[in-house]
Amino acid sequence: AAGVDMAMKPDDSGVLESAKMADCEISACAVSAADAIREALDKAQRPVIMLGHGVSDKAVRDQLFTLARQWKIPVITSVLEMSALPWDDPLNFGCIGGAYGHRYANMIANAKSDLLICLGISLCTRQIGTKVHEFAKNAKIIRVDIDKYNLQRNIHESGNNEMKFCADAAEVIRALAENAESAESDGSTVYDFSEWLAVCADIKKSLRAVDDSTPERYPNRMIADLTDALADTSAVAVDVGQH
């Protein structure tokens, strides 16, 4: 990670001004991002952690997952991070993607959540669709990314209800973990979104990853059967695209 990063500066109303970025030390950016996430969690009822390949260190991911388990927050990943959590992990709600993502992931992130905590994930059009401003219209979005150019584009129209921090996501996660330890030691707020996690589990159960309800869906059933037949150590090579 770079030694110095830049964070988007919110105006007095708390809405981020996407055209303005200020120099700051990475640790300061990380603390600012962690504080913003905690403040947003204080008000949220349906938060989701959106995890991308920008958080590729296993130790850092495990630190994040420890927090997610403590706070009962569902995790949705990019396609590159699909293996970050075991498939049957109670926190795992699949990968985002309009065409190739899981239906329950798209439903939870796009239509049901009120807070998206986006860590090292680009939110490109392959992930959220070409109608960018329609994505998660009712949710506050907090984006942490090391790529300042990726943060120059808004997800919400005019950047409303959206905060951006150009920082190392690993530093932000560590800052969150330290913040959580301090909160527990002094008896401050400890989050519990277990009711929301249960709602997400119901959505996942209803919108199965494999839809074999009609004969036209047989290819889905075939792939599922093939998966069941393969050993856990099997390697499968596939081409790209909507195959």
Question: Where are the regions a protein language model picked out?
Answer:
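Short, well-ordered alpha-helix to beta-strand connector turns
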Residues: 44, 113, 138-139, 160-161, ...
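Conserved beta-strand elements of the Class I
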Residues: 48, 114-117, 237
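Glycine-rich, anion-gripping cofactor-binding loops and their flanking helix/strand elements
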Residues: 53-142, 146
